[in-house]
């Protein structure tokens, strides 16, 4: 916020731009996601995400950064849904909690290494270097991913159209009245793609999948509404120095890394729904505590944040496992990408709503009304407990 001299509202728009574009692209991808190899889609999106990150590193004005975030989100929005679908296709439902725990272990390690390293770079170089590093490391990661990740094609229908056919059918929509009657081949292909739209609409009409989608949307809404502003809250209200905030991510990341595999096994053993209820209720405690203290030592604040990371991560593992069991194998790709679209939208709206509720005292630098954000997050969490009970498992 200091770099561009912006208020919380403008800061939230940077988050919203990424999430909005990610939500749009993920929803559009739902129409064709099950027609292609998961690996191809995943790595293509990852490549353009890397390019978008490099573009962010050259954004020396607020509006240029806004555009760069929007571009990056177009491809970042696909990664969550496609990677979850990839794992779900590989791992049966009864062992999926452990798999999601291992996936979350990766996020924990990223917090331990990535975020503190980014803060270190910001201190000693400039704030744009982390974006460059993300882009470069992402491009380097593509090499082993291309070589070693297995293809995932079992979900692809035998009558799948080629990319050329899809492009031709989409182009024909522009001159639909002419192509429909003058070119029978295009008419047939267009009808084929309209049937894909019907398949997506069928997913959206399924009551069980509606419950799963709403559950995922509100869970992320409550989580990100609170977590998006934790960093400026620690600096502005609890007196953290900017360089001290890296310890929150180090401690939180280590905590998540140590506990995620165990939590995943716990979820598989106790049951997905019961585990989720326990973990989300426990997550309310650090959320309410951290948002209501006015003074705290760094050690005390870090301890509270560690528990917040552990329980938030745990409830997300349980939620992901519940959600991936809702669709059938044939519906899974479309469903998870639609879910990814809603999650991106949810993240964006959570930041936008938080930016409207929060204000910053120009004299003290304190963020005001953060406790109201915590209350809303808890109420949304209670709603999620109800929605989780409505989800039925239909796939293995």
Where are the regions a protein language model picked out?
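Cytoplasmic helix-loop-helix junction between adjacent transmembrane helices
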Residues: 68-106
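Residue-level signature of mid-helix packing/kink "hotspots" within the transmembrane helices
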Residues: 19-27, 111-112, 253-261, 348
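C-terminal transmembrane helical hairpin of 12-TM major facilitator-type secondary transporters
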Residues: 273-318
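Helix-loop-helix hairpin linking two adjacent transmembrane segments in secondary transporters
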Residues: 102-150, 169, 176-179
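Conserved MFS/SLC helix-loop-helix module at the cytosolic interface between two early adjacent transmembrane helices
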Residues: 24-60
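Extracytoplasmic gate region of multi-pass secondary transporters
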Residues: 209-249
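Helix-breaking motifs and short loop linkers at transmembrane-helix boundaries and internal kinks
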Residues: 5, 37, 58-64, 293-295
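Juxtamembrane intracellular "pre-TM" segments in multi-pass secondary transporters
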Residues: 153-172, 180-213
